[in-house]
Each structure stands twice: as structure tokens, then as C-alpha cells.
Swiss-Prot record:
Tissue-specificity statement: Expressed by the venom gland.
GO molecular function (one): toxin activity
Protein name, per record: Cytotoxin 1
Organism the protein comes from: Naja naja (Indian cobra)
Keyword Secreted: yes
Primary subcellular site in the record, as a coarse category: secreted
Summary of the function given for this chain in its UniProt record: Shows cytolytic activity on many different cells by forming pore in lipid membranes. In vivo, increases heart rate or kills the animal by cardiac arrest. In addition, it binds to heparin with high affinity, interacts with Kv channel-interacting protein 1 (KCNIP1) in a calcium-independent manner, and binds to integrin alpha-V/beta-3 (ITGAV/ITGB3) with moderate affinity.
Quaternary structure (record): Monomer in solution; Homodimer and oligomer in the presence of negatively charged lipids forming a pore with a size ranging between 20 and 30 Angstroms.
CDD domains linked: TFP_snake_toxin
GO BP field: killing of cells of another organism
A matching Pfam family: Toxin_cobra-type
Amino acid sequence: LKCNKLIPLAYKTCPAGKNLCYKMYMVSNKTVPVKRGCIDVCPKNSLVLKYECCNTDRCN
């Protein structure tokens, strides 16, 4: 699986066991992601942070 880094022009290949890509936003500003990468389990959203997870190459 290949996931985009913070700047989507760059990506990385995920290590074994991390089979989801994710994008994290501040709830107050959903237009600008603050973090992207590989993850094993999609975190729950909080009052401050929103996560979007997916499982295809460069989907984040």
C-alpha cells in the first residue's frame, strides 16, 4: 500500500501491518490536512481532530 505524505506529491510505501492510509484534519479547518500517512487502525474522531481512512494506493 502506498500512502501520500503531507504534501500529496510525495508518498511512502507502508510497512507490514499498516494497511490503511489516513488523513487528519483539525475540526475547525477541514480544508487543510495536518497529517497524512500509514496507520494500522483508524483512530476515532475527537472534538478537535477528524480522521479519514482508506485502503487503496494514494487514496489519502
